[in-house]
Amino acid sequence: MTSKLDQLREITTVVADTGDIEAVARLKPVDCTTNPSIVLKALGTPMFADAIKEAVAWGKKQGGNPDAVSSAVADRLAISVGAALVKLVPGRVSTEVDADLSFDTEASLAKARSIIAAYKDRGIDRDRILIKLASTWEGIRAAEVLQKEGIDCNLTLLFSKAQAIACADAKVFLISPFVGRILDWYKKSTGKDYTAEEDPGVISVREIYNYYKANDIKTIVMGASFRNAGEIEALAGCDRLTISPALLDELSKDDGKLERKLSPESRKPDAKVSVDEKTFRWMMNEDAMATEKLAEGIRAFAKDLTTLRTMVQKELQLAAA
């Protein structure tokens, strides 16, 4: 029998949401996605011990403000994780712009360009990388500019149709609408359990997928943030799905039949609209779940980024002793 993972690969591009080199080599995804949490976890493994030593040695040679040096070394380490993953996948690796820049378009642009330049220094072309930005108004504006420069973007922490519409208006390459974190919010809010078909996160991604296909929007829809295999199965046929190694393993061991749930041919009419800034902010204001989960996600990624920079500072201090 063919596993559900292999059946899924026939209709959806499978992406691994991890920095685990061993898991990527074993599971053979097309792409990989990373974020500050994933980078931090990867750097805690022996695989990246030499990369940490190299980055710290590089940092020691840099002059200037210690905080700026720590930040630069942290960036270098994130690129090291991404560069290792690029060697293992035929497609792209997503590297995230600092979460604490989520409300600063110009700073996000500068950081994105520096990420692309850092990869180029390692012989990795921009067509192997996706720049991840939070789906704030400012992040979407940065992506709009980057796309015109030939730098493809992955808009993350996306919880609402308003964000998806704004991303479509900006002609971004790919969006990552979240599933599991939406479910978390509704379970906490209502105290209910949900089947996969009732799952508010699944319903959200299906609505966004349908809107894009109904209006011939070329932006790729990549469902993200899964709590269980049922959510993944309920989105079978989505353009791409980025999945943790644990859930990829679960799907690889299940020989049941996988039914396609999404396809461009099954789209229903959904009138195309555009959003300006005030409309976007109002729609977000009216969506408590999207507002809260976006803010929470930015805070969590910023916290992990701070943890990484603190680790770097300690390593630099030890190296200087």
Curated annotation (Swiss-Prot):
Keywords (A to Z) from UniProt: Cytoplasm, Pentose shunt, Schiff base, Transferase
Pfam families in UniProt: TAL_FSA
Reactions that this protein is recorded to catalyse: D-sedoheptulose 7-phosphate + D-glyceraldehyde 3-phosphate = D-erythrose 4-phosphate + beta-D-fructose 6-phosphate
GO MF entries: transaldolase activity
SUPFAM superfamilies: Aldolase
Pathway: Carbohydrate degradation; pentose phosphate pathway; D-glyceraldehyde 3-phosphate and beta-D-fructose 6-phosphate from D-ribose 5-phosphate and D-xylulose 5-phosphate (non-oxidative stage): step 2/3
Main location: cytoplasm
A GO cellular component annotation in the UniProt record: cytosol
Residues in coiled coil: none
Enzyme class name: transferase
Quaternary data: Homodimer.
Protein name listed in UniProt: Transaldolase
Species, as recorded: Rhizobium etli (strain ATCC 51251 / DSM 11541 / JCM 21823 / NBRC 15573 / CFN 42)
